[in-house]
Amino acid sequence: KMLSGNEAVARGAWEAGVAVASAYPGTPSTEILENFGRYPNVYAEWAPNEKVALDTAIGAAYAGKRALATMKHVGLNVAADSLMYAAYTGAEAGLVIASADDPAMHSSQNEQDNRVFAKLARIPCLEPSDSQQAKDLTVAAFDLSERFDTPVLLRLTTRICHSQSAVELGERAEPGDGTPKPFVRNIPKYVMVPGNAIKRHPVIEQRILDIAKLAETFPYNVIEPGDPALGIITAGVAYQYAKEVFPTASVLRLGMTWPLPAGLIRQFAASVERLIVIEELDPFIEEAVRLLGLKVEGKAIFPLLGELDPRVVRESAIRAGLLPAEARVPLPEVDPGALPPRPPVLCPGCPHRSSFYVLNKLKVPVNGDIGCYTLGLLHPLNAIHTTGCMGASIGVAHGAVKAGSPERHVAVIGDSTFFHSGIPALVNVVYNHSPVITIIMDNRVTGMTGHQGNPVNGQTLQGGQNQEIELEPLVRAIGIKHVRTVEAFDVKAVEKALKEYLALDEPAVLITREACALLPEARKRWVPLEVIADKCNGCTLCFRIGCPAILKSDELDERMQRPKALIDAGLCTGCEVCAQICPRDAITFRPEAE
């Protein structure tokens, strides 16, 4: 069956008998849990953040059930504390962390190589190079976890996650007899006070040495003999590129990239004249091979930055003399002007647009966060001035205030991100009395990753409906005295609240609430607007909200000599933000909608 890498990991987890899986959605890993949750006899959940997801998986594994935690690469930063203690404790049942790196930062704020976490934690790292291996190595990861009493890191990358290839399916294997096991009270193993942890450290050091011995015969570490003039060590999707560009070369394909099989690498190196490593991002394998005392080339030839592809590998090889210039594959001629530019933009009817319009109007420093609303930085809204990572907005605003910044700082954060890591930062604002204004943009869903449920709507991954957690009572319980919830599309209400908060010298929270325009309940309300051409004078004010549905018409206003506005009825959702800011009442609902 044709499966994406994410679908294959989900299938592998199900075949391996995984009972519990937890994740926070993040591209390119999101679809793993979405697909796993559709299988029978499993429990799958969206957690508020990746640390909670990993702790959940650890708890399930302590209780004797195989467990999986999935996340994108930066999610493992959030979960790192839990990863490190789990490396010390091990578990009663298999525990696997699937972490998806994002070379070229297609949807991420950085480009880190998470194989280093395996080395840091002294745990094995497996790295599939196609969908079949994604499934098979997931199964192998759970077997490895239980054999050596260790968490296992499954390192994926964007192209493995989202590319499809043929996968041979197997059946589910239920570990044991399937009956629930009582919790095992093993204090020296599971209670990481210093006296116990100091005894566990030698255990994990010996464990990684034992796994290194296994790596020599690990069935997914394979030498593919070829022309001895060139030997290539590679892993992950880079294997596919290596085989395409160097079809006759000798190849060592690594399915376990930590610990590395030192003996197998030496054997392979001795059989070739020139040894190179082709890998995405850091020179992780290359440096380990060099530490073995072997002559090897890697990042001196192939890029350190961005993702690889056959063209990049081929061009790099030509420059290094590994291939003749005749090997260059000419690219088809493309007219750069053949396609119009398509910059990212907030959707028509996005409930965040009005807030950014007001923030731009008020000219205040705005600290952004991770989500659809990051697009508020773009012209013509121009209303985001910092963005770092999940939950950073409130803390960064607080720091700027405490550094003596004379302006009032605003933090904008989405509902899902607030639950992810914004709550501790808001507690800090109250505790250390910082007059930060926080806008929680509540669009009732985790939007950017594909409309996953979260605590604000109570929708579970497997289709259930649990209790909704209300933002306003939560914020008041933290100690914020000035809290207000307004309709996100009500421009006057947003502006009035922000002006009142700017006059205060205390922390304040504004919750702007409206369902994401792409949710079914919002789509039912879509009724397009139109511009009354006779009233429009081309003032361009409506263009400043950056709505894709508002266009420049061919008709010029005689006095202003500017194009009048035109609304695309096929895009307009009828949010009325443009109508509210039009000074001439030139925007109204279409007659057929009334």
Segments predicted by a language model, with ranges:
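Thiamine diphosphate
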Residues: 1-131, 159, 225-226, 291-511, 521-522
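Short acidic, glycine/serine/threonine-rich loops at helix termini
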Residues: 32-35, 58, 79-83, 105-112, ...
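A glycine-rich helix N-cap at a beta->alpha junction
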Residues: 41-48, 89-100, 179, 185, ...
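Short helix-loop-beta junction
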Residues: 35-41, 242-252, 473-479
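Conserved thiamine diphosphate
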Residues: 102-151, 157, 189, 195, ...
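Flexible, low-complexity linker and terminal segments
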Residues: 1-6, 16, 128-346, 351-355, ...
